[in-house]
Curated annotation (Swiss-Prot):
The keyword Lipid biosynthesis does not apply. The keyword Flavoprotein does not apply. Residues 633-692 are annotated as: Disordered. It comes from Torque teno virus (isolate Human/Finland/Hel32/2002) (TTV). Transmembrane segments: none annotated. Residues 650-664 have a biased composition (Basic and acidic residues). It holds the Pfam family TT_ORF1. Keywords: Capsid protein, T=1 icosahedral capsid protein, Virion. One of its GO terms (cellular component) is T=1 icosahedral viral capsid. It is found in: Virion. InterPro entries: TTvirus_Unk. Belongs to the anelloviridae capsid protein family. This is Capsid protein. Self assemble to form an icosahedral capsid.
Length: 736
């Protein structure tokens, strides 16, 4: 064996350096005189170091009382610690869906086209966690079966970074957890990145040297007391709300793929603004037809576009004996000056067609209207053909931005918007129902108004907010968006009428196409072709993408994935369930290859009345009180049929406004107000009873008594919860 290293080993005395001889430190030059109070001179002891003991003194002055009291509570006999661990996409942003709310569109079913949205307002409750468990998106480490008590201890969330797309996140644990008109605008990256306590999730491209995830620890919500609650009470308590949006941290002030930050769009011209109604009666039908005949169809200058040939020529060639040259203006531009413009040179305000072209739209409208009626006879047909696709008042003949010459006027107006000049003061955004004839803002008729915010923030998540606020899931087809903005060129502002709004539309709608540029227009929509929110979303999307730090939809799909770990404790006094198997017919000593499954139960049905407890079991039998209680609550165990909800459960609620009194309607169901005395409320309701037949008055009184009964029962339940110690703050409810 080779023992040569023994001689080369480093002995302790050889390699240890020699201790430096102690010398007094050299005197330093005195520095300049200090203007503030001199520090206390520190006297250093020479020689061996000795520990110093200071005298005990009270810290912080005199003794004060505790800021928090420790309230003790009896623990249940059986406690299990449970972690709910799962994965989910917090945001799935398809192409050009940056301004949409993914929480609202997470359950959409689309055959083609972009999916999702670029922002989200996602809430988490115990019911939502169980819903995710049923979708096989999480697992529970311990079952909650027969354990009717629960404690929430917090959660941990991991955000996984995207390779190329950045995100901004803000977590809220303080109620109220409701959407208002400024919630979605505050989530725009330009607004959210200026707020406090935001979390940046940079892409791997933006910050390549860091971890591929961002971990966040979130505690229990504010106003939440840490104690044992029934699971049925904690089922709908909002635990936290996450606001998140995609952003661009590399190019925050415009995409490098464009040379202009301004947004161009069109608004309806002057002939439309007093005649915007779509549901017309017999008298209104005649008025509208005469108005548009004189102010739209008789204007030859509106036909100077290639869309005239595309919409009118095919039917003319197929149904009439006239050729297309019969409608073309043959006069050429000459050097002889005249008082009228009669030539066909559109570069100098000439007209490409003669007066006979104004008769064609009426023929084309009636032909296609009749063809559509024969194609879908079961559909409800409109009362007029003014909204026909090919030659109606919103046809591409009048609204397409491509004219024969770029200065040729149309039935629209071009608007330029610069997001960096928009101060927000004076801006108004609202929606009007399609049954409204004008675009003037009205506090009673107009809905979902947003005031004094930049357009790039006001349009962010606006369509989803309108849908939740009005309760109309088809809001995009039943309303139109109006806007007033003095920061455009020209200004969208009428100084004579400050409440006047303007209706904009997308480039594809003006060209007679669907959103996204598809030429395949459904036959029902060709029957009712008019401006609505569905055809305005592209302009709203473009304006939102022009704002600071906005995501520019460079990817077909961008996903922000998260992993969550909710910390719970289940407790209760269940009956001991002992399973005895036959010892001879059992399995072998080796374990089962199938992983052990944990059966989670809907927290809604894990309540005091629906669970057997140890005190219900006496001498091997169930007691009479327990059997009677379970028989009374047997209706709650009936499973309802599976149906698709109208809105995803994870989406936040909208703050409800006080309902207006309507003397013609029946008694309105309103929320329970505990601060109002029942006698006072009954007196107010009796005063609202209108005069009428005795039978109607008795029916209204019966409805009032039923409503009063429900309110008294809810008050009694709340008082009982307070006495039991199970009461929760009202703002913590997901419906609050």
């Amino acid at each position: 064996m080779a023992w040569y290293w023994w001689r080369r080993r480093r002995r302790r005395g050889w390699w240890k350096p020699r201790r430096r001889r102690w010398r007094r430190r050299r005197a330093r030059r005195r520095g300049p005189a200090r203007r503030h109070r001199a520090r206390r001179r520190v006297r250093r002891r020479r020689g061996r170091w000795r520990r110093r003991y200071r005298r005990w003194r009270r810290r912080g002055g005199r003794r004060r009382h505790r800021k928090k009291l420790i309230i003790k509570q009896w623990q249940p006999n059986f406690i299990r610690h449970c972690y709910i661990i799962g994965y989910m996409p917090l945001i799935i942003c398809g192409e050009n869906t940056f301004s949409h709310n993914y929480a609202t569109h997470s359950d959409d079913m689309l055959s083609t086209g972009p999916y999702g949205g670029g922002m989200t307002t996602t809430k988490f409750t115990l019911r939502i966690l169980f819903d995710e468990y049923q979708r096989h998106l999480n697992f529970w480490t311990v079952s909650n079966q027969d354990l009717d008590l629960a404690r929430y201890l917090g959660t941990k969330i991991i955000f996984f970074r995207h390779p190329t797309v950045d995100f901004v996140v803000q977590i809220h644990t303080q109620p109220p957890f409701q959407d208002t008109e400024i919630t979605a605008p505050s989530i725009h990256p330009g607004m959210l990145i200026l707020s406090k306590k935001h979390i940046l999730i940079p892409s791997l491209k933006t910050r390549p040297s860091k971890k591929h995830y961002v971990k966040v620890r979130v505690g229990a919500p504010r106003l939440f007391q840490d104690k044992w609650y029934p699971q049925s009470e904690l089922c709908d308590v909002t635990l936290l709300v996450i606001y998140a949006t995609a952003c661009d941290l590399q190019y925050p002030f415009g995409s490098p793929q464009t040379d202009n930050v301004c947004v161009n769009f069109q608004i309806l011209g002057q002939p439309y603004y007093q005649h915007l109604k779509t549901a017309l009666g017999l008298t209104e039908k005649t008025t509208y037809e005469n108005h548009y005949k004189n102010n739209l169809y008789k204007k030859i200058k509106f036909y100077n576009t290639t869309e005239t040939i595309a919409q009118l020529k095919p039917l003319v060639d197929a149904t009439t004996n006239q050729t297309w040259s019969h409608y073309v203006n043959p006069n050429k531009l000459t050097t002889t000056p005249t008082s009228e413009i009669t030539h066909n040179n559109t570069w100098y305000r000439g007209n490409a067609y003669n007066d006979k072209i104004t008769d064609l739209p009426e023929i084309v409208k009636k032909s296609y209207y009749k063809a559509t009626e024969l194609a879908i006879p079961e559909a409800v047909k409109p009362t007029t053909d003014l909204f026909e696709y090919h030659a109606g008042i919103y046809s591409s003949i009048f609204l397409s931005p491509g004219r024969a010459y770029f200065e040729t006027p149309g039935a629209y107006q071009d608007i330029i918007y610069n997001p960096f000049t928009d101060k927000g003061i004076g801006n108004i955004v609202w929606i009007d129902w399609l049954s409204k004839s004008d675009a003037v803002y009205s506090e009673k008729q107009s809905k979902c108004g947003i005031f004094d915010l930049p357009l790039w923030a006001a349009f962010f998540g606006y369509a989803e907010f309108c849908s939740k606020s009005t309760g109309d899931t088809a809001i995009a087809y039943n309303s139109r968006v109006c806007v007033r903005c003095p920061y455009t060129e020209p200004q969208l502002l009428n100084h004579n009428n400050p409440s006047q709004g303007y209706v904009f539309y997308s480039y594809n709608f003006g060209k007679g196409k669907m959103p996204g540029g598809s030429s395949q227009v459904p036959i029902r929509m060709r029957w009712k072709w008019y401006v609505c929110m569905f055809h305005q979303l592209e302009v709203m999307e473009a304006i939102c993408q022009s704002g600071p730090f906005a995501y520019h939809s460079d990817e077909k799909k961008a996903v922000l994935g998260i992993k969550y770990k909710f910390d719970w404790k289940w407790g209760g006094n269940p009956i001991s369930q002992q399973i005895v198997r036959h010892p001879c017919n059992g399995q072998t000593s080796s374990g089962n290859r199938v992983p052990r499954s944990v059966q989670a139960v809907d927290p809604k049905y894990v309540s005091l009345q629906l669970v057997w407890h140890s005190w219900d079991f006496r001498r091997g039998l169930f007691g009479q009180a327990g059997i009677k209680r379970m028989q009374q609550e047997s209706d709650a165990l009936t499973l309802s049929p599976v149906h698709r909800p109208k809105r995803p459960k994870r989406d936040t609620q909208v703050k409800e406004k006080t309902p207006e009194k309507d003397s013609d309607s029946a008694v309105q169901l309103r929320r329970l107000q505990p601060w109002i005395h029942s006698s006072q409320e009954t007196k107010d309701e009796e005063e609202e009873i209108p005069e009428g037949p005795v039978q109607e008055q008795l029916l209204q009184q019966l409805q009032q008594q039923r409503l009063l009964r429900v309110q008294l029962e809810s008050i009694a339940q709340e008082v009982l919860k307070i006495r039991r110690g199970h009461s929760l703050h009202p703002l913590l409810s997901s419906h609050a």
